[in-house]
């Protein structure tokens, strides 16, 4: 019963994230809309008037044009608030699916790839609400976040779904809660962090005068400096948690397998992720390193996390090969 409910809630959450993405796109489109301003009405002036005052002065918005611009801005704002409301609904459905899954399994819902992806993506969207509460001006990033949510949750539902089964013996430990919880939480923050990192690269290019794709998408994004700052804050917050997760995993491995580190594929890729993210923070703190270089390192770090999640579980054999897929 609870398992079926969880599956249904996941499906509804995907649809809700999709609707939120569309409404965010409407806000984006309205924000890019231009109000046509007609030429000013001709006036009869004296022969000596206009040489100084009229030359070079462009058309000024009429009252009608100003009103139209205000209406468009109001509609864009309403669409943005509506998109946030639908995203909240999607996140509640998402959370309900995780709770129902945990109740049905009588354990934390982190036992396989399907459950892990659902949990990481939920942490990402929940963290987004905290960012939005602190920085409402960043709302338009929601378009790209909801796109990521649709892709991840739909991938979990369509390709990674696994019926509820008991945990494999290797996971029956209190370290399961400690290690996996910190991995899930830090991965969710890294997921959110890659969104402003990519947005920064587009916005920085737009501010430098680039008008080709994809830089034109950044026309209505927040300022590049704000996006870059958010990228740093999220990664600086998540990196110590991820570091603890790696250490906790080594302690658990010592207790379970008799060695703390054996260069198992998942351990190797966790180390690669740690090195890349450490490199990002070092680059970010080095004045001589350009911000776009540091942002590319943040994106590379997330790609290594995705490799560790999908690639290692699907293509490698090791002690961590219990992703739940046949």
What are these regions (language model features)?
Residues 1-326:
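Polytopic transmembrane helical bundles with strong interfacial aromatic enrichment
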